[in-house]
Amino acid sequence: DQGYSRYFGDAKPGNKSANDWLGNRRMLEAFIQHESTEAARADSPPVLVFEAVGEAGRIKGQVIFHGVAVITRAELIVQREDGGRRRTFPNYVFELAPLDLSHENESLDWNWINARRNPSVAIREVLQLAPSAWKLWVESGSVGSLRRNVVTRGVVTEAMQRPNPGSIEAAILQD
């Protein structure tokens, strides 16, 4: 929420290269378009950012939509699997720049996504439905001030604010 997100590609441990995974290939293709000319950016796919969340004891199936992003970096890394054998494997990590949707009241017109899928709709017509930050990015090629930044309040519990028992600070509070 501070203007960037990271997405680890879809590679898994085994004998495949990081480039052999369909999701990684698609993200790399999108990255090339995102870093290309205005015409290529206009036709490039947006990255829709979702967060998986647990709900009512269920781990899968619930997501929160966080917005539309542009890929600003792709890096080949070595990743270690979670749990179990903890094997290492090559994968990509993609840096994403979520775009500001404040002009759209933090919502997305899904007609834009649907129009993108329709081959009979011209790219310029599709762009008319895009969020304003996406249009500006297509035009300029720079995400700079178009990044989404969410200001959050940090709420600290009372217990966390209290000094350790027996400390000088605790003695001051008792006086």
Where are these regions (language model features)?
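An acidic- and aromatic-residue-enriched active-site/binding cleft used to recognize and process polar
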Residues: 52-54, 71-74
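Secondary-structure-rich domain cores
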Residues: 45-46, 67, 73, 175
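Acidic-basic catalytic patches of nuclease active cores, encompassing PD-(D/E)XK
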Residues: 159-175
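Acidic, glycine-rich low-complexity segments with interspersed aromatic residues
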Residues: 1-62
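Generic detector of well-ordered alpha-helical segments enriched in charged/polar residues
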Residues: 29-33, 124, 169, 173
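A generic alpha-helix propensity feature with a strong bias for hydrophobic helices
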Residues: 16, 134, 166-168
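Contiguous surface segments at macromolecular interaction interfaces
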Residues: 61-66, 72-162
